[in-house]
Amino acid sequence: MRIAIGSLQCEGNSLTPVLTRKADFDLAYGPDMLAKLQIAELLEEKQIEVVPTLYAHALPGGPVAKADYLELAGGIVDGVPVEGIDGVWLYLHGAMCVEGIGSGEAYLLRRLREKIGFEIPVAVAMDFHADNSDEIPQLANYVTGFRTAPHADHKQTQLRALQALIICVEKHILPRPQISRAAVVIEGDAVQTAQEPLRSIMAEAERMEREIPGMLGVQVFNGQPWIDEPYMGPNFIVTHESDTAVAKQCADRLARMY
């Protein structure tokens, strides 16, 4: 099995005029990026050949300057081969805003799909506070995120995305995640997964994932309110191996629980 990996993160605030620049990112290229991630052991265990592209992480800040973003996103897309890979693993934030573009995650995934098409599975790991546009589940075959706030499961989240990607490759499946939304706006850091209403919602998501046959992933994203976009806010992405109707029903149920 041969997979390409990449990571581009910056939790954005579209309400500030101060741009985030390339110099604000911690960068690692090629094999050096594996030291920044927490998936090396599983890659070795499964004897997966890795095509590393770019790791770029910045602290939360304003919109990423367009030219700098295009260079960074291009570093990932250009590093993914057109042929000879079985899948793509990405570690993104989910609330990156880019000057003149909008969602940095959606743009990156669009560029990637333009290059590799839709017959290669793409798995994405994100932050719990991801503001996912409707494009995200249309462009990725699996989307997961942190399941703790405050965040204490970075490694588990990265591994979960990799494990799902391995399943997709081994079973030759291309799942189609489904998304639903809750029409509320809550300051992200005020929400903790150990307290209501998230405690019950997270428990139900875990039950769905555990008990429903063929369920690949049930993810709760609380979103964050500093992205001035229509897709800002809590969103729920559910991935079933083959049944999109079941996935949508589960996503809708979680949204109603908020």
Predicted regions: what is each one?
Residues P81, E114-G117, G145-T148, Q163-L174, ...:
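Generic secondary-structure signature for well-ordered alpha-helical cores
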Residues K46-Y55:
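Short beta-strand elements in bilobed, periplasmic/extracellular small-molecule ligand-binding domains
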Residues Q158-E209:
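Conserved anion/nucleotide-ligand pocket segment
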Residues A4, Q9-E11, K66-L70, V82-K171:
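Active-site histidine-anchored catalytic micro-motif
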Residues I39-E41, A73-E83:
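Short, charged beta->alpha transition segments
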Residues M1-E45:
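N-terminal amphipathic/basic leader segments beginning at the initiator methionine
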Residues L54-G75:
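Charged, often glycine-rich, active-site loop that binds/positions anionic groups
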Residues I3, D189-Y258:
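Hard-cation-handling environments
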